[in-house]
Amino acid sequence: MKALVYTKPNELVYRDEPDPAPGEGQVLIKVEASGICGSDMHAYHGHDPRRVPPLILGHEVAGTVASGKSKGERVAINPLMTCGICAYCESGRTNLCTARELIGMRVSGAYCEYVSIAERNLVPIPDSLNLVTASLAEPAACSLHALNKARMHSARPLSELRAMVIGGGAIGMLSALLLTSYGCRHVTVAETNGLRR
């Protein structure tokens, strides 16, 4: 398959890589769309020691199932791989699994033609949702998680509050959009980067 491989700081090489071989409980996904996360940019610039080259980056992804019983289904991928058996996983708090790994961090990510991932990490998407939009499911989930935490700890509904989102990147803007969809009428986005203002 073709892949965009991070080979050293400030260098990506488009080259042939072996097709991933799905393990037990995994399926092969044909990547149709992949977002560029700010963390991928940090890695590209050499500011993330956890991402050791050579590595295929990318964890915001949507595509089509290419193997298994769901072959042909359109999906977004939850890029967080977990053990599935610890107390955190069994209670639905997979983000706290101590064995968690993120695709594109230490294992191959989605800047390629195919990625293998556990079938439990697939999120079916309707035909009405385009795959580029679906690839934003992961950053949208991060925003929604923060918003749900705020709702849980607030004594008043969001529609009665003023909100400030610090940072106008993708997650910040998604957070602002979600806040307004929850009825928050006073949302301010604070951003120091002049290119984003």
Stretches with model-predicted labels:
Residues 130-197:
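Mid-domain Rossmann-like dinucleotide-binding core that forms the NAD(H)/NADP(H) cofactor-binding site
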Residues 7, 18-19, 52-58, 103-107, ...:
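Short Gly/Pro-enriched turn/cap motifs at secondary-structure boundaries
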Residues 37, 79-123:
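Cysteine-cluster motifs in flexible loop/terminal segments that predominantly coordinate metals
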Residues 62-69, 113-136:
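Short Fe-S-cluster ligation motifs
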Residues 39-45:
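Cytochrome P450 core scaffold surrounding the K-helix E-X-X-R motif
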Residues 8-10, 23:
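Residue-level recognition of beta-strand termini and adjacent short loop/turns
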Residues 2, 26-28, 161-162:
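Residues that mark the start of a beta-strand
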Residues 18-34, 47-87, 126-128:
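Glycine-rich beta-strand-centered segment in the early N-terminal region that forms part
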